[in-house]
Amino acid sequence: MAALRPLVKPKIVKKRTKKFIRHQSDRYVKIKRNWRKPRGIDNRVRRRFKGQILMPNIGYGSNKKTKHMLPSGFRKFLVHNVKELEVLLMCNKSYCAEIAHNVSSKNRKAIVERAAQLAIRITNPNARLRSEENE
């Protein structure tokens, strides 16, 4: 079967691709890079001084049409079993399935086979599937 394609694939425009880093995380090892809002009374990042690192705010949000969209043009739907896969039957042109991390390899095989029958794309079909020669 040919590769499954989305119904429409709009151009995804990100307003910012660089990560927002924590103030002074480049200066000290103990301060991790993960973003934390500065709350100090004299903090220049919080007061938005020129030349300081930028803070995340509502203006950096994505376009409503392309929010949560993968580069392939699909949106992800987390699947734990074959029954949950049936939900995507009518919207297989806009949503793709992603098998949850705690699903056994036996159930993964069943999900992948059923998805092929329903023409549903899976983002991680090869995860935790061992070949026969290794068993």
Curated annotation (Swiss-Prot):
InterPro entries: Ribosomal_eL32, Ribosomal_eL32_CS, Ribosomal_eL32_sf
UniProt KW keywords: Cytoplasm, Isopeptide bond, Phosphoprotein, Ribonucleoprotein, Ribosomal protein, Ubl conjugation
N6-succinyllysine PTM positions: K50
GO biological process: translation
GO cellular component entries: cytosolic large ribosomal subunit; synapse
CDD domains found in the cross-reference section: Ribosomal_L32_L32e
Molecular function GO terms recorded: structural constituent of ribosome
Chain positions with Phosphoserine modification: S62
Record-linked PROSITE patterns: RIBOSOMAL_L32E
Coiled-coil intervals: none
Record localization: Cytoplasm
Covalent link (Glycyl lysine isopeptide (Lys-Gly) (interchain with G-Cter in SUMO2)) residue numbers: K9
Keyword hit for Ribosomal protein: yes
Nucleotidyltransferase among keywords: no
Family membership: Belongs to the eukaryotic ribosomal protein eL32 family.
Subunit organization: Component of the large ribosomal subunit.
UniProt function note: Component of the large ribosomal subunit. The ribosome is a large ribonucleoprotein complex responsible for the synthesis of proteins in the cell.
Name of the featured protein: Large ribosomal subunit protein eL32
Native source organism of the sequence: Bos taurus
